[in-house]
């Protein structure tokens, strides 16, 4: 019975990321794309772990990755290294985050409230 509800949940979440399936950038702030590009640039220059966003802060650079979690950018970098553009890797990262958070919330609610959740 849980598989049926899980599939219903996944079908209901499709409209959530329908704008992300179109070409180009959808309406959002572009700092995720900028940070993914800076993370890609930092790794391509041979820095590990990546800490410095060289083009941030009006070109002076900022230690963005010291203070902001790097995990989403590592996941996006997997898609980037597989040959996708930066915009597409950010979109896939967002879609993956939406789907995984919905599935995790489903199982968490099920654990607390049983079949009512």
Specify the residue positions occupied by each region the protein language model found.
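Active-site lumenal/periplasmic loops and adjacent helix-entry segments of GT-C-fold
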Residues: 15-113, 117
